[in-house]
């Protein structure tokens, strides 16, 4: 590696090949490889280590990144507007006619040793196949002419291992959910310790879209910010915000080590993939309980699992690091406020959650709340933070 330098492999939910080629590769002399999922990391490492194929692999990679950068440079970006103009074009909500539902409790509640069999019912299987580089939507992928045979094989293997981990209780599923009084001041959401709304727990600084929005049917689309969906403090409306953290990661590393000791890398990767799917399913299950019971703002909701996967419910659960809330740093305040240490969840120096198979975020209940991509910011918003 002295000649090749240490390779850098990039992956994760918020990364992409374009981001790797444009933002990372030009600033590192060694090989930089975008790895879309964990199952491909072994083959990528093998290619980088191989005396026969490494040189061509690295050169092909660099040529590909040059092409991607050229395509990116030739794309016409939407012009940005000033922060003042973006705020004037915020999502307009009639707060005078909105009465927020009050959660059944204020503060936090911990859920330990949740039944894995119940969580498994909420699994979205489509991303599971992406882990194995199999493109297609479940269940149609099982009959796909190109990848159907392989998809059926890994799905059968997944079902068998899932059955074993549920019966053997290999993993532990824990969650913490919290509700707090909340109101907005500008683009910031302020969480309070109690109904007096005098003692802030923390201020969640949010970002607003600044790209010039298109005009549809004579109406310009709004420049959205998550703060638009929580009542402003000066409205006099007593609003609320939910916070959560779930994990199905306890027990994963121990079992993975057992598989690796037997040189069974396939089962080790399969278990990690299932643990990740269970974590996302656990987040879906708890959000369902929040909507229908713990907060109860959609107590009459009756949706199938497919409808929940398609997000046909009221409200959203934005997570730090994703397009509507790209800043990972908010995880520090989020996990502190909900006391994530009670479920064994911590943050690494790079703001990743530990255990890895974990999900955290917020609950916004307003009927108009939706996901969006913050996108490119202008200097005035960066300076305003």
Locate predicted features.
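Short, ordered loop/turn segments at secondary-structure junctions
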Residues: 10-15, 36-39
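Short alpha-helices
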Residues: 37-42, 277, 281
């Amino acid at each position: 590696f002295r000649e090749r330098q240490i390779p850098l492999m990039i992956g994760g939910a918020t990364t992409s090949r374009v981001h790797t080629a444009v933002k990372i590769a030009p600033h590192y002399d060694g090989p930089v490889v975008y790895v879309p999922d964990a199952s491909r990391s072994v083959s990528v490492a093998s290619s980088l280590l191989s005396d026969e194929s490494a040189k061509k692999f690295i050169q092909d990679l660099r040529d590909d990144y040059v092409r991607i950068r050229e395509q990116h440079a030739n794309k016409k970006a939407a012009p940005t507007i000033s922060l003042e103009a973006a705020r004037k074009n915020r999502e307009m909500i009639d707060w005078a006619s909105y009465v927020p539902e009050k959660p059944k409790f204020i503060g936090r509640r911990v859920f330990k040793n949740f039944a894995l069999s119940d969580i498994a019912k909420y699994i979205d299987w489509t991303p599971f196949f992406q882990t194995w580089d199999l493109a297609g939507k479940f269940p149609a992928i099982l009959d796909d002419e190109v990848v159907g045979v392989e998809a059926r094989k890994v799905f059968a293997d997944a079902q068998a291992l899932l059955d074993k981990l549920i019966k053997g209780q290999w993993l532990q599923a824990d969650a913490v959910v919290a509700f707090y009084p909340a109101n907005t001041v500008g683009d910031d959401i302020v969480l309070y310790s109690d109904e007096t709304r005098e003692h802030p727990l923390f201020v969640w600084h949010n970002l607003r879209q600044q790209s010039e929005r298109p005009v549809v049917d004579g109406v310009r689309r709004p420049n959205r910010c998550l703060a638009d969906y929580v009542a402003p403090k000066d409205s006099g409306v007593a609003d609320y915000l939910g916070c959560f953290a779930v994990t199905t990661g306890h027990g994963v590393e121990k079992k993975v080590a057992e598989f690796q000791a037997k040189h069974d890398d396939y089962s080790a990767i399969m278990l990690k993939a299932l643990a990740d799917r269970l974590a996302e399913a656990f987040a879906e299950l708890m959000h369902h309980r929040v909507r229908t019971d713990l907060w109860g703002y959609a107590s009459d909701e009756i949706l199938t699992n497919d409808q929940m996967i398609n997000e046909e419910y009221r409200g959203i659960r934005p997570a730090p690091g994703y397009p509507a809330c790209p800043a990972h740093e908010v995880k520090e305040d989020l996990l502190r406020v909900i006391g994530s240490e009670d479920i064994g969840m911590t943050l690494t120096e790079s703001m990743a959650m530990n255990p890895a198979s974990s999900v955290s975020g917020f609950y916004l209940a307003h009927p108009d709340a939706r996901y969006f991509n913050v996108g490119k910011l202008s200097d005035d918003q960066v300076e305003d933070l």
